[in-house]
Swiss-Prot record:
[4Fe-4S] cluster binds at C308, C368, C371. It catalyses: (2R,3S)-3-isopropylmalate = (2S)-2-isopropylmalate. Pfam families: Aconitase (PF00330). It comes from Citrifermentans bemidjiense (strain ATCC BAA-1014 / DSM 16622 / JCM 12645 / Bem). Catalyzes the isomerization between 2-isopropylmalate and 3-isopropylmalate, via the formation of 2-isopropylmaleate. Keywords: 4Fe-4S, Amino-acid biosynthesis, Branched-chain amino acid biosynthesis, Iron, Iron-sulfur, Leucine biosynthesis, Lyase, Metal-binding. Heterodimer of LeuC and LeuD. NCBIfam families: hacA_fam (TIGR01343), IPMI_arch (TIGR02086), PRK00402.1 (NF001614). Binds 1 [4Fe-4S] cluster per subunit. InterPro entries: Acnase/IPM_dHydase_lsu_aba_1/3, Acoase/IPM_deHydtase_lsu_aba, Aconitase_4Fe-4S_BS, Aconitase_4Fe-4S_dom, HAcnase/IPMdehydase_lsu_prok, Homoacnase/IPMdehydase_lsu, IPM_dehydratase_rel_enz, IPMI_cat. GO terms for molecular function: 3-isopropylmalate dehydratase activity; 4 iron, 4 sulfur cluster binding; metal ion binding. This is 3-isopropylmalate dehydratase large subunit. HAMAP family: LeuC_type2 (MF_01027).
Length: 427
């Protein structure tokens, strides 16, 4: 019997199996940010274990509230900063160099097919887009990862999701993953890996694949995975060219991590996206999804474009295409947070930032702040936000606020009209 990508990674990284079904894996990359890591740091220090297993395998960034908004967040940032310096962690990104972790770390080339990746952040599954097993973990597991370079997992079964057809005009990766979550439900992939495949995935950029995998957790998934292919190699080539004689050689090496043709899946789901319309959430769960035509006319107070889901350059490009030469509705606050400094620079060079500002957007530094209601876009009670983020839980972006999740294209159209709007009318 063949193996899935996840099974291959588990087998290659197995260190111990202390209990039936529980496997201790060696970890290739431990990611850290200033919200969850300081808790682990403080506990390790209290127990006299202020050590790291390998500083070259730890990547750290201040990204959630940046610059710090108050003494509490400044203290959290300082703890991470001091810890990184104390342990000579070279890949630490402070104010000015920092970006949203799940956009910044792929941009830096830190992930490879077949890697194991952990972080104290539920959207760590983003990095599965590279053919890695990437999962968010709790504080105790993060501590063990930092100290020993290992982490225990129950080996997850894999759900294969084939995205068939071709995405229609005005429909993007965000719409595709909302369709998947709407089909599975918020608990449909609990303790499972969602392996994305099919013609739609084959046609996607790495940025779009990251959007897919980013929201695997919203269906309960431990991780999302796309099998490595030529698109993966092309994206990674600037970082791996010294290790391979050619892209063909790299592809052959990374293809060993692809699921075998006779791999056994717990479930195989086929979704034809050829007739998919732009989608939008309507409630307080990511699986509460309707077409934009059903949601059209819903008034919004704020539009937010950014986050680890949709703050990348291709997201900004499609939104700017819609916004060029137009103004946002007079009653709407529109906020753009490019996910990394490089994305910001590229957007400036391409004239995108000018388009956003001319339309009436406020452009912030790279930050996660608005997504979790901590800074740079918090909602007041009763306010409604059309957002390209990944969670619409009650109070997620501010106590008493309502969040509608949608694509950058739909967000841009909604900013112009001041209500949920169909982007196909502008493309």
């Amino acid at each position: 019997m063949g193996m899935t990508t996840a099974q291959k990674i588990f087998s290659a990284h197995l260190v111990d199996e202390p209990f039936a079904g529980t496997k201790v894996l060696s970890i290739d990359v431990v990611m850290c940010h200033e919200i969850t890591t300081p808790i682990a740091i403080a506990d390790l220090m209290a127990r006299g274990k202020d050590r790291v297993f390998d500083p070259t395998k730890i990547k750290a960034v201040i990204d959630h509230v940046t610059p710090s908004k108050d003494s509490k967040t400044a203290t959290q940032a300082k703890m991470l900063r001091d810890w990184a310096r104390r342990h000579d962690i070279k890949d630490f990104f402070d104010i000015g160099a920092n970006g949203v972790c799940h956009a910044l770390f792929p941009e830096k080339g830190f992930i490879r097919p077949g890697n194991t990746v952990i972080m104290g952040d539920s959207h760590t599954c983003t990095h599965g887009a590279f053919g890695a097993f990437a999962a968010g973990v709790g504080t105790t597991d993060l501590e063990v990862g930092i100290l020993k370079g290992v982490c225990a997992f129950r080996e997850p079964k894999t759900i294969r999701v084939n995205l068939n057809g071709t995405l229609p005009k005005g429909v993007f990766a965000k719409d595709a993953i909302l369709r998947v979550i709407g089909h599975l439900g918020v608990n449909g992939a609990t303790d499972r890996v969602i392996e994305f495949g099919g013609p739609v995935v084959a046609q996607m950029t790495m940025e779009s694949r990251m959007t897919l995998c980013n929201m695997a957790i919203e269906a309960g998934g431990t991780s999302g995975i796309c099998m490595p292919d030529q698109v993966t190699v092309d994206y990674l080539w600037p970082f791996i060219s010294g290790s391979f004689g050619s892209k063909e050689e790299a592809l052959a090496a990374y293809s060993v991590w692809c699921s075998d043709a006779d791999a056994a899946y717990e479930q195989v789901i086929d979704l034809d996206l050829s007739d998919l319309a732009p989608l939008c959430t309507f409630g307080y769960k990511p699986d509460q999804v309707k077409s934009v035509t059903e949601m059209a006319g819903t008034q919004v107070d704020q539009v937010y474009l950014g986050s680890c889901t949709n703050g990348r350059l291709e997201d900004l490009r499609v939104a700017a295409q819609i916004l060029k030469g137009k103004k946002i509705a007079s009653h709407v606050r529109a906020i753009l947070s490019p996910a990394t400094p490089q994305i910001y620079k590229d957007a400036v060079a391409e004239g995108l930032i000018q388009i956003f500002m001319d339309a009436g957007f406020c452009v912030t530094n790279p930050t996660c702040g608005a997504c979790l209601g901590m800074s740079n876009g918090v909602l007041a009670e009763g306010e409604v936000c059309a957002s390209t983020t990944n969670r619409n839980f009650m109070g997620r972006m501010g106590k008493g606020g309502m969040v509608h999740l949608l694509s950058p294209a739909t967000a841009a159209a909604s900013a112009i009209e001041g209500k949920i709007a169909d982007p196909r009318n502008y493309l």
